[in-house]
């Protein structure tokens, strides 16, 4: 069986590029923008590096550029992270602004670190600390809150918010694992007998 993003279990990710390849240039993401949209893009990029697939790396870069357009907004203090809200976004539809979820900041941060874009990763992390649409901190002495509603922070403090915050913070401090330089990875795989 094939998963929703085209990769069959145990395939080593060989099917990952297919839905991205079939996506239209104006909407290079396979499907609507829902939750954790940066994760498949990061997976495609990691697959491209690990198996020396230039097409996968290029498709991942194209999809990440598309996500940047929809997830980062210029503001008075510079760029801020502004994820798609929980009503999701289909092509040709307006972006739902709320309820923004912590998982989005964490996933964007990890992807941008993986792509070597630390500044954007830091901007995504600052979403938790008030660099967001409402300039409302989502973390205080009691921990992170569950999201950003039109009226301010969702005061619930669930495990997802806590884990998203801690994993994002850890990645900023320690970096993503494994740390792979794109040029070195592509050359190393080739040297080990990978296909050009």
Locate each region found by the language model.
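Glycan-recognition and catalytic cores of secretory/periplasmic carbohydrate-active enzymes
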Residues: 1-196
């Amino acid at each position: 069986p094939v998963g929703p993003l085209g990769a069959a279990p145990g395939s080593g990710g060989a099917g990952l590029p297919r839905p991205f390849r079939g996506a239209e240039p104006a909407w290079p993401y396979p499907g609507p923008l829902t939750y954790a949209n940066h994760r498949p893009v990061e997976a495609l990029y990691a697959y491209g590096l690990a198996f020396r697939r230039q097409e996968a790396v290029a498709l991942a870069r194209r999809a990440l550029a598309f996500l940047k357009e929809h997830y980062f907004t210029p503001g008075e203090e510079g760029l801020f992270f502004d994820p798609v809200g929980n009503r999701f976004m289909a092509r040709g539809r307006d972006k739902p602004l709320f309820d923004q979820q912590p998982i989005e900041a964490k996933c964007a941060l990890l992807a941008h670190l993986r792509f070597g874009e630390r500044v954007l990763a830091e901007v995504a992390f600052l979403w938790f600390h008030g660099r967001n649409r409402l300039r409302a901190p989502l973390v205080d002495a009691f921990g992170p809150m569950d999201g950003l509603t039109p009226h301010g922070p969702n005061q619930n403090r669930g495990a997802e918010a806590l884990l998203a915050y801690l994993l994002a913070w850890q990645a900023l401090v320690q970096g993503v694992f494994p740390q792979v330089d794109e040029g070195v990875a592509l050359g190393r795989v080739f040297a080990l007998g990978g296909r050009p």
